[in-house]
Amino acid sequence: MEQTYQYAWIIPFLPLPVPMLIGLGLFLFPTATKSLRRMWAFQSVLLLSIVMIFSMNLSIQQINSSSAYQYVWSWIINNDVSLEFGYLIDPLTSIMSILITTVGILVLIYSDNYMSHDHGYLRFFVYMSFFSTSMLGLVTSSNLIQIYIFWELVGICSYLLIGFWFTRPVAAKACQKAFVTNRVGDFGLLLGILGFYWITGSFEFRNLFQIFNNLISNNEVNFLFVTLCAVLLFAGAIAKSAQFPLHVWLPDAMEGPTPISALIHAATMVAAGIFLVARLLPLFIVIPHIMNFISLIGIITVFLGATLALAQKDIKRGLAYSTMSQLGYMMLALGMGSYRSALFHLITHAYSKALLFLGSGSVIHSMETLVGYCPKKSQNMVLMGGLTKHVPITKTSFLLGTLSLCGIPPLACFWSKDEILNDSWLYSPIFAIIAWSTAGLTAFYMCRIYLLTFEGHLNVHFQNYSGKKNTPFYSISLWGKEGSKISNKNFSLITLLKMKKDGRPSFFSNKVYKIDENVRNMIQPFLSIPHFGNTKTYSYPYESDNTMLFPILILVLFTLFVGFLGIPFNQDGVDLDILSKWLTPSINLLHKNSNNSIDWYEFCKDAVFSVSISSFGIFIAFFLYKPVYSSFQNLDLINSFVKMGPKRIFSDKIKKVIYDWSYNRGYIDAFYETFLTVGMRNLAKFAHFFDRRIIDGMPNGVGLMSFFVAEVIKSVGGGRISSYLFFYFSYVSIFLLIYYFLNF
């Protein structure tokens, strides 16, 4: 066992040869490297698979022995400064390593087909491998300096991947927004690291925790300064994990390729903030009020993310706000001191969200058959619907991921979210009410995404956005408002999206959406794609092929069974709670005397309420978004609920307020644009003016004045001796007069 730990330092570096060799190959043998590009995808998967096997071996040893191993090398040693580098293998490291490698491998396999038409294929796999290296280095770091180095590398990789299609202006702006927003948190993290080093004199975790606990117990620190340093450390996690108020970069990050979205939202960038708080939890616990602040940020993010997801039309942005809300649950659990629940939800959410993003990528991939490469169309749920018969495997997989995130048993997220919800009652009834209400909202907006995408009819083939044919029945539109009636039957709303030059309306354009050499050129109306032994020609959305479906099906298995990893049942002496063994010793401020095991009756009693709330949210979503003609064609049921009147008008106003809040991102982006972005730009313009006109103006003015004076003197002198003698005697006379009057 000791020998296995000794070679654990290689974990972060195993994926690194791929980007290095690709770069070397493109420099020395560009043609051969590009022609054999599929080989590099295999190499990436192979090396990351080796890391996964290594991590699983370490995890088994962690479960059996509950031990931690740390190895450090001294780099700088003197009387004042001691800087060490090394690696730390403990339960948190092993959990994160397995999470990163399993999701990373599946995303790489998926990307091989998804990015096959892209000219940036090799560049994509370079970024992905370097991303895996950075994240693995982060989770194995043994001190704050290493954390910060790999933290910045993760940020760089996310910047490169979000702006992968950098020739699209919206993608370029998105990666800049992510980079600048994370700079705020990263600067706070750096200041917090330096502050705690100034207090304790150590960057290494174990020494830092021990020294700081001694200082706190002896009351030898300034609590105001310590709290400030802790808040600065937490600011890094706020930005990285898209917590309020630094969450604004996350939905814009959807401009990158869909596999990147899956990796960022499941196991890398956004998970880094949760990992940092979990790693530093022994430090935060002993600082008054900081845990309350963490839980407050978490509960605000939980509710805000859910409300902002309610009216999103872009399928990836809807999932992005879902990620934001679920990360809020994890942060809430950490703030409550429920360490096990937070990590449990991190695991279950990672696989469920990866499944949803890869499923959405499959849907987008199939929609491009009809609308070409145009994210505003291929990702727009308004134009989807009725995909069940076209992409049945993707539909079933997406449904399982949706139900998991809704908290429906026995799927993965049910077990972890239910644990957090139950713990919230012990911490704060107010927080519990918000958390439980948000569970219902989660079920509503996730079911809404599913229904708009897969149920009904394919809306690009019909006359309006409500997903129905012309019927006399009342229609429920995208937001659940009354569908407007169009008197001219020959006019269709969908024709407003595309008009040909001859004036005739047409949704399908012959134009190829090509963006230099960085995006796929796909708008063929008919594609021949082999999948599962069938070769057909499609004029409708088609099911993805094997290399995209295989990772989705594996993630379905994880979504079905990974929740059983942490089932807290203890019956007849059989302890099924593997996660608690894995995390021993674990921090739990809410159950200090508990062994994390409950009986079936107690568990069912606690679970019934959460499942009821989720079921209510699902029912409301079905009531509003299930196609009217398929559910109530023979019963004019909807009209009985929506007759106009004072109550109806008031409810419409309430829905409009909620819709505007959600669709406009809570006006937070507009607030930042008005008061921060515009203000900073005006300040930069003033600084530029002051620097050029005032700071540079003074020496330039002196030089210019000297030049003109010299020119005047030059013109007056003219090189004649009489002129020189005249000026000489004039200056002497003036000097003598001044001297005379001063001494008079």
UniProtKB/Swiss-Prot annotation:
> Which family, according to UniProt?
Belongs to the complex I subunit 5 family.
Which gene is annotated as encoding this protein in its UniProt record? ndhF
Q: Which PANTHER family match?
A: NADH-UBIQUINONE OXIDOREDUCTASE CHAIN 5 (PTHR42829:SF2)
Question: Per its record, how is this protein called by name?
Answer: NAD(P)H-quinone oxidoreductase subunit 5, chloroplastic
Assembly and interaction partners: NDH is composed of at least 16 different subunits, 5 of which are encoded in the nucleus.
Q: Which GO terms describe its biological process?
A: ATP synthesis coupled electron transport; electron transport coupled proton transport
The GO terms this record gives for MF are: NADH dehydrogenase (ubiquinone) activity; quinone binding
Enzyme class label: translocase
Q: Which Pfam families match?
A: Proton_antipo_C, Proton_antipo_M, Proton_antipo_N
Ranges that cross the membrane: 9-29, 40-60, 89-109, 125-145, 147-167, 185-205, 219-239, 258-278, 290-312, 327-347, 354-374, 396-416, 425-445, 549-569, 608-628, 724-744
Q: What is its EC number?
A: 7.1.1.-
- Classify the main location: plastid
